Amino acid sequence: MWFQLSSLRSILNVSTALRQAVVRTPWYAKRKSYKVLFWREITPLAIPIFLENTCVLLMGVLSTFLVSWLGKEAMAGVGLADSFNMVIMAFFAAIDLGTTVVVAFSLGKRDRRRARAAARQSLVIMTLFAVVLAVVIHYFGSEIINIVAGEATPEVKGLALTYLELTVLSYPAAAIALIGSGALRGAGNTKIPLMINGGMNILNIIISSILIYGAFSWQGLGFAGAGLGLTISRYIGAVAIIWVLMIGFNPALRIPLKSYLKPLNFGIIWEVMGIGIPASIESVLFNGGKLLTQMFVAGMGTNVIADNFIAFSVAALINLPGNALGSASTIITGKRLGTGQIGQAERQLRHVFWMSTIVLTAIAWGTAPFAGLFASFYTQEQDVKEVVKVLLWLNAAFMPIWAAAWVLPSGFKGARDVRFAMWVSMLGMWGCRVVAGYTLGIVLGMGVVGVWLGMFLDWAVRGALFYWRLVSGRWLWRYPRVKRE
């Protein structure tokens, strides 16, 4: 009895101490304002973005699942081609970010004309660029796959080339969908991009299923149907984006078709590119480094390529809430600074950062015990599943530093602080991930686990530097210094 009372007293003392510690934090005094921020600003932005990203990734997982029935060589081919496609999509997404920030900032200042001009001209410039890029990549497709695939088997290289040549045709449509969705998000409308991108990805699954496996008496196209289905669905999504902008679902961004023929305003283009170009350099160099580490993995055999691809697919699902909160922080920061609310922008970014850290860590630690189950959706090969489990447990162990590495720079970009992120990204990727990944994975023979440890070192360096940038306040260098409220 005495022991039970003593234990109860100890528990109460710990509980009281924890409560007092929470009460003394700056967060507690402002908890009501943070509650308003969460429900009125973060939730309306982040939840549709989260659902949109979830839909995109789940459709990607289902697409991979469809291809996986054709064999691990087909899955490896898609993984290799997509590792290059992701570099291009990252470039488009960086310009999309520039459009989002300029639109959000312009509407914060109630300048609708400038917001529409930024969206329209970004669409024109990036569509033309995507057409040229698609032609060049299609012409040099074999050389690109030979570089990316490294020592992969000829069969895997052939499948990767087929997939690349089909998906490269979708680049103009992907540019339109990304830029248009970014402009709508900058205007605070996240539901329409959710509906369009969600519908586009559902169509991708339906069309790809029919094209791969056939319907009724038609036998289908086999592996080629996967790339063709993706391309067709992206063009449907691009048409939907143009239509939404044309009829003015969001009055602030009504862009008639004939307005695309107007002369370009290079002042606005440079404003968008001033954010988009450093962000695109960051994305291309970062994803180029990822591509190089993919080449390390490609030389380890088909099974290891599948291990890496499956683990990345599952990890991407775990990171979805953080990506959504990062996108929301870009929009919130841009709008706050557009109205001159510098102190609010700083407080709200800190709140989003800590929220992301807690949520992602809880999800990663909660899902790690089920890593083998997730791997079973992709493959039944036991050796592949064992490696995937190791990678996902490592991912969970390092998840507490993920938000500092990825959510904070998203908020900084809303303040147009893009060059610092570019340099940090280059340092983290090329100074840590590539060097450490090669040393651990290839030189020391740790395989794909060593490559992933190099990635976690990149997270740590990025997180430390971005957190220092937040605490120092230097990310607000474009705005007058104010006394913190």
Regions found by a protein language model. Give the residues of each.
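Transmembrane helical elements of multi-pass membrane transporters/channels
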Residues: P44-S63, L166, S233-G237, I241, ...
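Interfacial/gating helices of multi-pass transporter permease domains
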Residues: L66-M86, P154-L159, F223-A224, L228, ...
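Small-residue-rich hydrophobic transmembrane alpha-helices
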Residues: M75-V135, A174-P193, D307-A371, W402-S425
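N-terminal transmembrane alpha-helices
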Residues: S33-F65, W69-L70, M86-G98, T127-A134, ...
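Helix-terminus/linker motif at the lipid-water interface of multi-pass membrane proteins
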Residues: L58-A76, I145-P154, I210-L221, S280, ...
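Short runs within selected transmembrane alpha-helices of multi-pass transporters and secretion channels
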Residues: D96, L166-R185, P193-N201, A226-I242, ...
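Short alpha-helical transmembrane segments in multi-pass integral membrane proteins
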Residues: W2-I49, V103-S170, W218-I277, T333-F398, ...
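Transmembrane alpha-helix boundary and packing residues in multipass membrane permease domains
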Residues: I49, N53, T64-F65, D82, ...
